[in-house]
Amino acid sequence: EVIGGILMPGDGAADPSGVTHMLAKGARMEGAQIFEKSPVEEILTKDGKISGVKVNGQKIDCEYIVLASGMWSRQIAERVGVSVPLYPAEHFYIITEPIENLSKTLPVIRDFDNSTYIKEDAGKILVGIFEKKSIPAFNKTNIVPEDFSFGEFPENFEHFEPYLASAIKRFPVLEKAGIRKFFAGPESFTPDTNTLLGEVPEIKNFFVCCGLNSIGIGSGGGVGKVTAEWLMTGHINQDIFCYDIKRFQKFHSELGFI
């Protein structure tokens, strides 16, 4: 059944929390200020241009805003009439019980035909899916609660089971491995599964950097660099229209479409 595969020896794994703290430390070293637990209350504009933001009752004057609020980006942008075609879907994975003699250097394996991915996780195996027909999150409303940062959905093993069966067929070691954790949580996606970058057409100096389609840990550094260059120079010296938010029309962010 397996005709061949592609190995990328330069790939690796990273701790998301560690990477986040590293980037935050680097930003602070360059003079950036970071305010946690500070929800955006209002985006301020004047004459069709960004003028500031209101956070925790405090008005902060600014010339530019970069919206990088993950799955909350769409509803934040809506407050000022900006269309961001982003939708949260339910994402599933399981973590097995510990497996004896499991290699810590097991490659992260993507089985595109069966929509699964498999990787080592502290002596256990994680099996996740990126299925073609996913389940819309939050009852198809696309309204993400403000306090849902680490929230989970009820288990849906009926939806996950066919993909697990395919994974077991590909990796028989899973057949006798118990399941320690079944995770179901939201992940936001764009209609074409490409990132949303660049200045929005509705408001000048309003940039977006969101819709990373569950590959933020791998592409975050690159999209951050591109966004910074774009913001500082007003253009980018390469063709990245496939990521430019202007590739979409207003109707693309309507619930009936996404």
Q: Which residues does each PLM region occupy?
A:
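Helical element adjacent to the flavin cofactor pocket in flavoenzyme catalytic cores
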Residues: 6-64, 68, 72
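Active-site catalytic microenvironments for nucleophilic, acid-base chemistry
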Residues: 26, 30, 79, 226-234
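Flavin-dependent oxidoreductases
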Residues: 42-141, 145-154, 162-170, 250-258
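Conserved beta-strand segments of alpha/beta enzyme cores
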Residues: 33, 83, 175-178
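The feature captures the short pre-catalytic strand/loop hairpin that immediately precedes
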Residues: 2, 139-142, 200-204
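C-terminal catalytic lobe of FAD-dependent flavoproteins
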Residues: 113, 122, 152-258
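A short, glycine/Asx- and small/polar-enriched loop/turn
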Residues: 1-2, 44-51, 189-193, 203
